[in-house]
Amino acid sequence: MMALLHKEKLIECIENEVLSGGTVLLLVKNIVVSEISYMGDSYKYFTFNANHDLKSKEDLKGATSKNIAKMIYNWIIKNPQNNKIWSGEPRTQIYFENDLYHTNYNHECIKDFWNVSTSVGPCIFNDRSIWCTKCTSFYPFTNIMSPNIFQ
């Protein structure tokens, strides 16, 4: 029963990210493999190869934020150590091996991600405002797997 409640709570957290962000990037080993964006009146789903080239684009007609959250949850659960998400505006976050990246480009941590984001292109990263663990608190999904985080 606790596991089911935990799963539902985690899906709710992801749905909140989907609703508040508008764009969610899915990363495997810190490489963007997919993007889900809300555009106009529907969600769009993009996939990329390791060189950040667009592989496919799909219109998810009829999808709801709850459907999208469940899809992301199932994807994360397959490999919570390597699968991460990045959520777009207004709370822009990137999960990179327990590090967050930051708008202060003087921070060392921003440089690698900035290279990745500019190579992916502005159509993928609508907002390059990134946070850092030195400046804000956050929890990566690998830590959310513990049910007591919700108590």
Swiss-Prot record:
Q: How is the cofactor bound?
A: Binds 1 Zn(2+) ion.
Supply the alphabetized keyword list: Early protein, Metal-binding, Zinc
Give a GO molecular function annotation for the protein. Answer: metal ion binding
Cofactor dependence is on:
Zn(2+)
Q: What induces it?
A: Expressed in the early phase of the viral replicative cycle.
Q: What does this protein do?
A: May participate in a redox cascade for the formation of disulfide bonds in viral proteins.
Q: How does it assemble?
A: Monomer. Homodimer. Interacts with protein B119L. Interacts with membrane protein E248R.
Q: Which family does it belong to?
A: Belongs to the asfivirus A151R family.
Q: What is this protein called?
A: Protein A151R
Q: Which organism is it from?
A: African swine fever virus (isolate Tick/South Africa/Pretoriuskop Pr4/1996)
